[in-house]
Amino acid sequence: VLGGNSKEREISVKTGKACIVAMKKLGYIINTFDPKKKSFFEIKKSKADIIFNALHGEEGEDGYAQSFFEYSKIPYTHSGVLSSMNAMNKLSSKKIFIENKIKTPLYYVIEKKGFVHSNLKKKLDTKKLKFPLVIKPNNEGSSIGVKICKNFINLKKNIKVLFKNYETLIIENFIGGQEIQVAVLDNKALGAIELKPKRKFYDYKAKYQKSAKTDHIM
């Protein structure tokens, strides 16, 4: 399953095509399914042995697709419905981290409905948030919509832009440091990679565009 309707569609298609090449080399028979072209309900008719989920972002990683996979009663790869919902929803993730005493940056949630700019400075002070700050959509992947704000004017500008497409935003203290990724399969770490982007941070372009020239250190 690849493509879909999210802002990460292009990356999902690339992911899916790479997986198809690899799986065909291993002798598997592959049928592709793109939710942008067919209804998820059509999956049940496929009679597939397993669904390989190569979707990215909204409807692909937030529990939506997973609920249809469960409905189809066909085994599928990657996380289930609840874990996908919590992982894609940054606020839910942060609450789980806090409940389990896992460190996470201080934050403040703002909603498009009823938001008042004049109250923001006081709220940031109350939440002990200091510049530079990070603002991002609550439900988005691949660093889409993530902005680092150095001052209040910059923050207000980005809030206005992001509210055009998103209802809920999260403002956090910026935490600098190393960017390290660790893949885990069946509770086993497969190795770590340090990422050194040439850009300000590991944003969408740094992740996916060769021109960004991000260094990957094994």
Regions found by a protein language model. Give the residues of each.
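Active-site nucleotide/adenylate-binding loops and adjacent lid/helix of ATP-dependent enzymes
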Residues: 1-2, 14, 30, 44-45, ...
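Residue-level detector of flexible, active-site-proximal loop/helix-junction positions
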Residues: 37-39, 58, 83, 111-114, ...
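Phosphate-binding site of ATP-dependent enzymes
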Residues: 150-218
